[in-house]
Amino acid sequence: MGFPKVERLLINYKTLDEFKKFKGCGAQELSMLEELQANIIENDSESPFYGIYYGGSLIARMSLYMKRNGGEPFEITGPYLELYKLEVLPTFQKQGFGQMLVNHAKQMQFPIKTIARIHSAGFWDKLNFNPVSVTDGDFYIWHPETNLNAVTNEESA
């Protein structure tokens, strides 16, 4: 068995069965089951779901959406990713699988916006996300380092 990797999840009934394993493991606000069912009904071929399989079973998942423009108060200009939900089965938590999912999103080189749910602020801090408080709630934002380095290199020239 090879090392687990992040892959885009297919929108089908097999994935729906895998998602049912997560029901009851986490908070209701993390449930993606209804979201996946809606995508199956709409026959949406562009899956927003990513996951990690281990031993043939889905052990970690996230939903990731491309947004057009963040604007103010989010400190994002232009397109960005919204990492809407991330969940790892309890048996596999604290083993780096959540970080693997986030790193996969970071490799796309767009700013990322997320909400720290269920005592996860420390997780987002560790992954270099910055907290942003607005009237709608508290968010965490990550900016691609390449953009920051480009500015730094120009300033030093």
Curated annotation (Swiss-Prot):
Name of the protein in its database record: Uncharacterized N-acetyltransferase BC_3921
Ranges where the N-acetyltransferase domain occurs: 9-154
Organism (species): Bacillus cereus (strain ATCC 14579 / DSM 31 / CCUG 7414 / JCM 2152 / NBRC 15305 / NCIMB 9373 / NCTC 2599 / NRRL B-3711)
Statement: the UniProt record of this protein carries the keyword Nucleotide-binding: no
Lineage: Bacteria, Bacillati, Bacillota, Bacilli, Bacillales
Gene3D superfamilies linked: 3.40.630.30
Keyword terms, alphabetized: Acyltransferase, Transferase
Pfam families cross-referenced by the UniProt entry: Acetyltransf_1
Primary enzyme class: transferase
An annotated Gene Ontology molecular function: acyltransferase activity, transferring groups other than amino-acyl groups
EC number: 2.3.1.-
CDD domains with a match to the protein in the record: NAT_SF
Domain of life: Bacteria
SUPFAM superfamilies linked: Acyl-CoA N-acyltransferases (Nat)
